[in-house]
Amino acid sequence: MNMEIAGHEFFDVDGSTIWYDLQTPRGEVFWLAAATPDGKRRWYHLDRDQWSVHFNISPDGKKFAGDGGDEEMVAHARDGKWIYLFTPRAIPDVAGISAPNADDLVHPGTLQAERLVDMKKHDYRLEPNIIFTRDGKWLIFRSNMHGDVHTYMVEVAKHAN
């Protein structure tokens, strides 16, 4: 697509699938997309305010996290300054109208977002760079929301069910 952009790549837990921020076109429609070693593609749609500078995946591969963004960034999010927990939801083919080559096409889905941390006082010139702990129970990120740069943790476990 003309004006399509992709970036801020990261790998799945096993290192075989690459995930990335996809915009079709730039700054208009937002996806968290994946390409697998066997050529399959998965695109999870998210709203403008849920777009994040960086995404990451939980150790069990069942959740994603995003570090949000502000109005100055490509999404121009009006209310996007949040640390997010995302649950992926595939869109099933319930109508039975699959294309003959459906396996070769993009498999669509959506991301159900939950806001974990209000980042409205964070200056996004410093990227939070979220990461899950190995046990998947916490997200670690950095922020200047209280002035100096500090490292923070937010519990995921109570939100992940």
Regions found by a protein language model. Give the residues of each.
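Loop/turn-rich, solvent-exposed surfaces of beta-rich toroidal or solenoidal domains
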Residues: G27-F30, L46-L111
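Hydrophobic beta-strand positions in blades of beta-propellers and related beta-sheet-rich domains
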Residues: E9, F30-A34, K81-L85, I130, ...
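Blade-level signature of beta-propeller repeat domains, shared across WD40, Kelch, NHL, RCC1
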Residues: L126-N161
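Conserved beta-propeller blade repeats
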Residues: M1-D21, R48-M73, K121-L139
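Short strand-connecting beta-turns/loops that link adjacent beta-strands
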Residues: D14, P25-R26, D38, D60, ...
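Flexible loop/turn segments at secondary-structure boundaries
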Residues: G27, M73, D123-Y124, G147-V149
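A short beta-strand motif characteristic of beta-propeller blades
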Residues: M1, R41-L46, R115-M119
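Short loop/turn segments that connect beta-strands within beta-propeller blades
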Residues: T36-G39, R89, A157
